[in-house]
């Protein structure tokens, strides 16, 4: 049977429990028509790139489906009817990924970065004040040291 990756986005107002119920409902439709869900991943509540149906965030869920095309057609029909589902996308694949998807690996990597803690000073270059190698306000090459600034009155008088 053909293999599919199916992702749907549920409204931000829906609770995690409601999203799990939606996933169970969709899985039931798939299995009722002779298909099989090999993997389910809930990516959680994530920000959308742009607003969809007045929503700025959505719950993302991915299903790996092994079943005939009639299963996908029925699942998509059910999702068009359901008001809690904002968008969906089904892609036919040659084989399913083993292990976690790219989105789950990214979430794990981000969590590891947060666990490391922040750097002192907050920036990549650290504190740039008072480094000692820039006397007089920066490297001037062959131009020599800076001369003192003149007042506006003195500058105007010297021009005349």
From Swiss-Prot:
<feature type="region of interest" description="Disordered">
    <location>
        <begin position="94"/>
        <end position="160"/>
    </location>
</feature>
<dbReference type="InterPro" id="IPR020814">
    <property type="entry name" value="Ribosomal_S6_plastid/chlpt"/>
</dbReference>
<dbReference type="GO" id="GO:0070181">
    <property type="term" value="F:small ribosomal subunit rRNA binding"/>
</dbReference>
<protein>
    <recommendedName>
        <fullName>Small ribosomal subunit protein bS6</fullName>
    </recommendedName>
</protein>
<dbReference type="GO" id="GO:0003735">
    <property type="term" value="F:structural constituent of ribosome"/>
</dbReference>
<keyword id="KW-0694">RNA-binding</keyword>
<comment type="function">
    <text>Binds together with bS18 to 16S ribosomal RNA.</text>
</comment>
<feature type="compositionally biased region" description="Basic and acidic residues">
    <location>
        <begin position="125"/>
        <end position="152"/>
    </location>
</feature>
<keyword id="KW-0699">rRNA-binding</keyword>
<dbReference type="InterPro" id="IPR000529">
    <property type="entry name" value="Ribosomal_bS6"/>
</dbReference>
<dbReference type="GO" id="GO:0006412">
    <property type="term" value="P:translation"/>
</dbReference>
<dbReference type="GO" id="GO:0022627">
    <property type="term" value="C:cytosolic small ribosomal subunit"/>
</dbReference>
<comment type="similarity">
    <text>Belongs to the bacterial ribosomal protein bS6 family.</text>
</comment>
<dbReference type="InterPro" id="IPR014717">
    <property type="entry name" value="Transl_elong_EF1B/ribsomal_bS6"/>
</dbReference>
<dbReference type="Pfam" id="PF01250">
    <property type="entry name" value="Ribosomal_S6"/>
</dbReference>
<keyword id="KW-0687">Ribonucleoprotein</keyword>
<feature type="compositionally biased region" description="Basic and acidic residues">
    <location>
        <begin position="94"/>
        <end position="119"/>
    </location>
</feature>
<dbReference type="InterPro" id="IPR035980">
    <property type="entry name" value="Ribosomal_bS6_sf"/>
</dbReference>
<keyword id="KW-0689">Ribosomal protein</keyword>
């Amino acid at each position: 049977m053909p293999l599919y990756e199916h992702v749907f986005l549920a409204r931000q107002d829906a609770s995690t429990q409601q999203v799990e119920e939606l996933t169970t409902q969709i899985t039931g439709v798939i299995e009722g028509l002779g298909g099989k869900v090999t993997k389910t991943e809930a990516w959680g509540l994530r920000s959308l790139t742009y607003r969809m149906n007045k929503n700025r965030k959505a719950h993302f869920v991915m299903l790996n489906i092994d079943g005939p095309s009639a299963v996908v057609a029925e699942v998509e029909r059910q999702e068009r009817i359901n008001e809690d589902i904002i968008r969906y996308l089904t892609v036919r694949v040659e084989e399913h990924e083993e292990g976690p998807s790219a989105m789950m690996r990214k979430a794990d990597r981000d969590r590891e970065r947060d666990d490391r803690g922040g750097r002192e000073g907050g920036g990549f270059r650290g504190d740039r004040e008072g480094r000692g190698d820039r006397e007089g306000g920066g490297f001037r090459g062959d131009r020599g040291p800076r001369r003192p600034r003149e007042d506006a009155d003195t500058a105007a008088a010297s021009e005349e």
